[in-house]
Amino acid sequence: MIQIPFNFEPYMNRPNNHLYAISVFLFLLPSIVMVLTHAAWFLGIEIGAWIFIISLILSAGIIFLLEKQPIRANITGLFVGLILTWGSIYVSGQFYDCSFDGQWYHQDAIILISEGWNPIWDNPIPDADASGLNANYVNHYPKASWAIQALLFRLTGNIESGKSIQYLYWLSLIFLLTHFLRARLSFSWIKTILLVLFVSLSTVSLGQVHSFYVDGLLYSLFGIFLVFLIDFVYFKKPTGWLLIFAFLVLVNVKFTGLVYGGVLMLGATLWVFAQQKSLLKRSIARFALAVVIGVGIIGYPTYVRNTLSKGHPLFPIMGKKNEGKMIAEVQYPLDFFKKNRVQKFVAAHRSIPIYTDHDHASVRKPLFNARLIQDSIPYFKNHQPVTMSPFGPFEGELWVLFIPIFLLFVVRKQPLELYVLLGVLIGSLWIQPEFWNLRYAPQLLLLLAIFVATSMNHKSVWVGRYALFFSFLFVINSVLAVSQNWRWVFENNRELRKQLEPMRNSCVKVQAGWMKSFELKLKTNHITPIYTLDTNAVYEPFLGDAFSGWKYMKEKK
């Protein structure tokens, strides 16, 4: 028998306070940046490095005041948090966003804000100043992520560093969930690690970590807000102010964040009213304050201005002349137009992972076909999450393996609080008509995690082992999907950098495309674009760039 020459047990059983400190620091730093940026907008003050410095000091100070934790745990948490923050900014800055929306209106908004546009007091951006001659999304979409990213752009001089908030909130969720499972639910380390991997290796989060898309942010913030909420109303922990901060960011990252956050708070209010009346006044006060600040103040440039100018807070996805239906149907396969929401969900999650569009229908997947699974893996070499089998190449098989876990949950009486939690999560899914699309309802993974976690703690050892085995397979499935996406990102970046490098410190004749953000790539590489077109020249697209439409003049040999 192999003997391990070192005993890790004392280290594994140490208090988990430092995990909480790390999580809170990583969560607070970008969140305070967002709040201070909005404060600067209201006051008409130019945003700059001072916001980041103040946010850093406040975040460090707050983690020492939250709970009666050992000073050493807070110092450790702060030190690790600083390293992870620097690492996130550095890594994000090394990769260009290759996605469609990320290079389009997301970077448009970040550039405009960094150049001084104040979305509270300034006039809306005219269509002529936006990529694709469409400023609707820049003017009317929630602006929390753009506020933080514009500040990071000003701080580093590299717009790509703004993507680091994907890592920061994702890592915050990982440490927060690890602490929650260990400190609140007394999960063993093996159960904790597998369940945290199950939740965190989301194809939404990791599939968008190299882009400015906000669906992954929505998922991380949803999870963070949910944990703070459970801590507050069930475990009676002093997380009221943290959940307010989480709500502020959640509802201003994406419109659906407001809807999902509202559903979670409604469920929490009903629980407190029925089971924790001593918390009722405090809970309602915290929730009301969160809504007023989140929608009326931080959300002023979005929800209030949309209502005043367009008659609906959620314009352009709702209200007069809205684009909601069109946006939702962009990713519809041919066979989805006549299906209801449940039929679309079933079709999407049992389909072969294949390319679909308005001319190509989903195809029901033959299960447990090893060759088919292997052949479908390259499909995930794309922006995540994909629409068909979004969890990975053998998602269909995992749904079959999930059936025993679901049935064991149903036949066994569960605690009331578990039914309430499931009901709230299901409600947050059902309220989204397009919950078949994992991008729009990423919390589906959290719902599955609750069933798995319950089975892990089943009184039968074999049921617990089966849940661990299922979690392991799910993690492998996620890794296969995400690794393909990362490969796609790395290859595109390699090709683009390979082409831009020889052009550094030179003037290059270019044909401008429709995405304005590509010009920034040229300028950050010290390339001076010359827009005088040569009708006799041959212009070729930049390698690794599939969307912007920019071309350069190829030198004649």
Predicted regions and their residues:
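Lumenal/periplasmic acceptor-binding loop at the mouth of the active site in multi-pass
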Residues: S114, N118, D122-P124, A144-R154, ...
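Hydrophobic/aromatic-rich transmembrane helices and adjacent perimembrane loops
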Residues: I53-I54, I111, V214-F222, L250-V253, ...
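Signature aromatic-anchored transmembrane alpha helix within multi-pass, membrane-resident enzymes
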Residues: M12, T76-T85, K236-F247, T256, ...
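Membrane-embedded, lumen/periplasm-facing catalytic core of multi-pass transferases
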Residues: F469-I530
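Membrane-embedded, hydrophobic transmembrane alpha-helices
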Residues: M1-A73
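Active-site lumenal/periplasmic loops and adjacent helix-entry segments of GT-C-fold
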Residues: S88-T178, S211
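Transmembrane-helix motifs of polytopic, lipid-linked glycan transferases
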Residues: S31-V35, S59-E67, L151, S161-L185, ...
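Membrane-interface transmembrane helices that cradle and orient dolichyl/undecaprenyl
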Residues: L185, F225-G240
